[in-house]
């Protein structure tokens, strides 16, 4: 696999790139569907929840807090606003559990970061500011990164803003992430390079058509990353 050249900054996504996140959300959703089983089957609950999440994104953004509000809103709708307060409290507790994720680094992450310490390493992730900073501290990885930027969404505009903040040309920045839609495509669009590291589970909002590109490499394990530089 051809190596990248003239890279000064390596930006890492956080959730499902540095640590596991989506599997915890999926587990909460399964337990949520059990609570709502008197009102609808699991597929209906999940489909309606996704619709509520999507409609709330412009106001609430991403992350555990936004997800919790969507859980409650969807539950009230599906139950015809008849759900017992005790069940609403159970749902709130489920959502709050996502704010206490262990953020244990995925296998190979620490080794890859150690091998890349000669580069300027940054975190570029979307979500809720306090939640993401808290997870980074719990992960024990914060010492590897000179900059952390949390955005409401990853777009060409926010990617260019990151480059301006870091005072780096897009062509000298490499993005590493698990979401083709959020991590890879916007960076390629502005002239940066990218390494795609798919995770075993992906939130359906992140599903998109993938494509080949001369500035893109795909690896199956983040431990393979240092060999590309």
Predicted regions located by residue number:
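Asp-based, Mg2+/Mn2+-dependent phosphohydrolase catalytic module
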Residues: 1-7, 86, 110, 114, ...
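Active-site neighborhood of HAD-like aspartate-dependent phosphohydrolases
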Residues: 2-48
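A metal-dependent, Asp-based hydrolase signature
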Residues: 38, 50-97
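Glycine-rich phosphate-binding "P-loop"
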Residues: 93-98, 145-149
